[in-house]
Amino acid sequence: MLQIKEQLKQLTPYQPGKPIEEVKKEFNLDRVVKLASNENPYGCSEAAKEALQIEVQQMALYPDGYSAALRTKLASHLGVNETNIILGNGTDEVIQIISRSLLDPASNTVMANPTFSQYKHNAVIEGAEVREVGLLENGCHDLDAMLKAIDEQTKVVWVCSPNNPTGTYESGRNLIRFLEKVPEHVLAVVDEAYYEYVTAEDYPETIPLLERFPNLMILRTFSKAYGLASLRVGYGIASEQLIQAIEPARQPFNTNRLGQAAALAALGDQAFIHDCVRKNNEGLKQYYDFCDEHGLNYYPSQTNFVLIDFKRDADELFSELLKKGYIVRSGNALGFPTFLRISVGTKEQNEGFLKTLAGML
């Protein structure tokens, strides 16, 4: 019998939100609205769509394995050198690269709980000990407790800010104080997948911190605000020395041709991003007002989703909404058994969803 790694037996494949077509078929619905996967309801930039029309003619050719054009544009946009960037098949792959490069059975890694599931998933595959630290009551990371969990065997500490699934963030003051205390032998990863949506004035600009903290790595993505989730383009920003050290763990041709072209074009259309952020803030207010009106607790969000406590079994409410044509994310698998995580849709989608929800409370 094949001897599969023992640690894989405690894992299950990542469970994304239900596909729209599957829900239509299952419940015989003509219209289904997906508010589960924190996708951009406004799609992507027209410039990205135009770039795809050109690039699709080259699908028989392998992509640029170094993503040179995108890397150059991205470096200019971020104000860093090209050698400070590693590109991946979504930030999921960059997380995998980090884990593959640093973690082993003799090491441990520290993270919040609940937070993005792929930090733990990849650490378990590498055989590392996972040290999880509960969130504070306000949904933020307990950074002091995370520091206490670090020891000589710790290789990576993960900070998801804004955090998924709470939408909460770490202030600049708190994050810098934390980074000052992280030992030099530990890589501090700050996952900023929702960076573009953040409006909090005390949210830190982390890229300038790279010079001060050579053991810092920042993760960002084109899947959220840029609306390119299906094309899988994410990236990490760190010191040149760190990027060079982990590059061998990257798969060849890992960022596909269409993704590179669309991301390159999308970077040039920041007006689209600003418009999406404005609409997202208006959408968040719709949810906040609804919660205040109905006495529901929620975590104020710096993302394009909101986590709401309905004081009832999340799976049951999820199933009821599914039958009515709304796909959301049950908090049961996210560590919040009475909460739903709801992606912010268009104004019309939000209105329809909240009207349906009001009739179920």
From Swiss-Prot:
It catalyses: L-histidinol phosphate + 2-oxoglutarate = 3-(imidazol-4-yl)-2-oxopropyl phosphate + L-glutamate. Its EC number is 2.6.1.9. Keywords: Amino-acid biosynthesis, Aminotransferase, Histidine biosynthesis, Pyridoxal phosphate, Transferase. The keyword DNA-binding does not apply. PROSITE patterns: AA_TRANSFER_CLASS_2. GO terms for biological process: L-histidine biosynthetic process. Pathway: Amino-acid biosynthesis; L-histidine biosynthesis; L-histidine from 5-phospho-alpha-D-ribose 1-diphosphate: step 7/9. This is Histidinol-phosphate aminotransferase. It comes from Bacillus licheniformis (strain ATCC 14580 / DSM 13 / JCM 2505 / CCUG 7422 / NBRC 12200 / NCIMB 9375 / NCTC 10341 / NRRL NRS-1264 / Gibson 46).
